[in-house]
Amino acid sequence: MNLKNYIFTHEMKVRDYECDLQGIVNNANYQHFMEHSRHELLDSLGVNFGKLHEDGIDAMVAKITIEYKIPLKSGDKFVVGINLERKGPKIIFYQDIYRLSDGKLCTKGIVETICVENGRLTRGEIFDEIFKDYL
């Protein structure tokens, strides 16, 4: 686990209610972890996701692919690493989740996002400015 390879990292801890009957994190919660980390990335850049919506700008997930490697369990501390790139009208987020206790890769995600401004699909140039240091 080399967290220096990511433009942003965010640490979290698994809560009991995020686990299923098998005692591991329910697969849907990995999407929540990734979404929260993307919002934290924006926040670290001085951008509030809710305020974007109020201003008529909505970043939306168009496609998500998640590869599950090993499960997280209740109480596990983990880190989400993020990289991103622009591909045409989409911003693609590459998000990896590592368990902090041993540095093992738990999940790899690719999240393709689009931008809708005032109800119309756009290229989302505002995100070029927001992510200018990373694109």
Predicted regions and their residues:
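Hot-dog-fold acyl-thioester-processing enzymes
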Residues: 2-60, 116-135
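HotDog/MaoC-like acyl-thioester-processing domains
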Residues: 3-4, 9, 73-74, 84-135
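Residues in well-ordered beta-strands of folded domains
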Residues: 13, 67, 112-114
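Short, well-ordered turn and helix-capping elements at secondary-structure junctions
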Residues: 16-18, 64-70, 101
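Hydrophobic beta-strand-centered segment that forms part of the acyl-chain substrate-binding groove
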Residues: 41-92, 108
